[in-house]
Amino acid sequence: MLKKFFKEISYKKSYVLAFSGGLDSTVLLHMISLYIKKIKNNNNFFKKIFKFRAVYINHNICKESKYWSNHCHDQCLKYKVFFKSINIFISDFSEGIESSARRERYKALFSDLNPEEVLITAHHQDDQIETILLSLKRGSGPRGISGMQSIKKFDSHIIKRPLLHCKKEDIKLYAIKHNLNWIDDKSNLNIKFDRNFLRSEIIPLLKKRWPNIGNTISRSAKLCFDQEKLLNELLKDTLNSLVEKDKSLKFIELFKMSEIKRFAILRKWFCLNNFKMPSLSQLKHIWKNVIISKKDSKAEIKINNNIIKRFKKNLYFIPIYSKNHLKNIIFKTSLNHSKKIVLPYDLGTLITKPIMINENFIKKINFFYYNNKKKFIFLINLNYMKKMSFTVKLWILFIC
């Protein structure tokens, strides 16, 4: 297992381990510490350019989380690995505890990554089986059944899973052999959660009946991944011709396609925007109630934390943000009346234009201060009702 691991890791990279203190990530931490010793013994120059640290995400859900953070810190101290604990607080559980925690965990990990760093996770073959079985339960297509990949690019970041082809039993034997100390999270025994149910009740039965099922499921996942990759190649040119610079989708050409190709294009558009794959019923709803609905209707559908909306001949992804989230955004930019100002979080673009104002207008303006001393910007928001059935918001900014 160590030989395979050393082949997966390059001393030229900078790595960040998602460290929970559990069995799997503890084994991975130990393996990396051995790798550091190995390259140090070979050449001290390698040690200098190989960078590695561990990050623990405290979800603040379990009362033991503080203890777990301390345990992870002690383990990293033992191996002389830089450690960081990040606190997150989940306010939206609409996707369920597991999915919501996973979403916020990865958001925190990616936010902490430097551009040159690769995120390492301790997912193994049994995790892959769970993921694929859950995809089958949801009725997923080839992309879902392809499961996790040993290397995956997500936006500008890379995730590496060097233990993905290792069996859970082998990982535990490794931990016992090296006398490792890890955390057993009792919540993993709660079978009301689907993943725990599969882990505790279903997968042991499958392995007992078919001992090699982990390898065969992984092989099927690889075949599905190859099919999905081929589909991407075949649809690439068509998709590129339909997607605008703002990532909106021109849907007129979809009317000329078969339903199979049309839905495949829509799925690829979701992937391009890094959003969760829609179900078949959601795709049908987008087509029937958004794309081909009446022009004067409010053609939109809410999927997770986004709204799919039609405007003229294009489909748009519009993120849903809470008012509190938007209030906390600090956005700095140089103001030039001849340029457009692109707002963060895909909130749109401001077109700047100089205007004449009077004294009464100035009295309505809100003042913002920098360090409570230097006045640097005025901001006002006015609503204008047009004859159309929508509201236009005008933001006026001044530099003092």
Swiss-Prot record:
Sorted UniProt keywords: ATP-binding, Cytoplasm, Ligase, Nucleotide-binding, tRNA processing
Binding-site positions, ATP: 20-25
Entry keyword Transit peptide: no
Swiss-Prot/TrEMBL catalytic activity: cytidine(34) in tRNA(Ile2) + L-lysine + ATP = lysidine(34) in tRNA(Ile2) + AMP + diphosphate + H(+)
Top-rank EC class of the record's enzyme: ligase
Gene Ontology BP annotations: tRNA modification
Claim: Hydrolase is one of the keywords in the record: no
Record localization: Cytoplasm
Gene Ontology MF term list: ATP binding; tRNA(Ile)-lysidine synthase activity
Alphabetized InterPro entries for the sequence: Rossmann-like_a/b/a_fold, TilS/TtcA_N, tRNA_Ile_lys_synt, tRNA_Ile_lys_synt_N, tRNA_Ile_lys_synt_subst-bd
GO cellular component terms, semicolon-separated: cytoplasm
Enzyme Commission code: 6.3.4.19
Main subcellular location of this protein, as a coarse class: cytoplasm
Purpose of the protein: Ligates lysine onto the cytidine present at position 34 of the AUA codon-specific tRNA(Ile) that contains the anticodon CAU, in an ATP-dependent manner. Cytidine is converted to lysidine, thus changing the amino acid specificity of the tRNA from methionine to isoleucine.
Domain remark text: The N-terminal region contains the highly conserved SGGXDS motif, predicted to be a P-loop motif involved in ATP binding.
Family: Belongs to the tRNA(Ile)-lysidine synthase family.
Protein name per UniProt: tRNA(Ile)-lysidine synthase
Organism: Wigglesworthia glossinidia brevipalpis
Lineage per the UniProt record: Bacteria, Pseudomonadati, Pseudomonadota, Gammaproteobacteria, Enterobacterales
Gene (UniProt): tilS
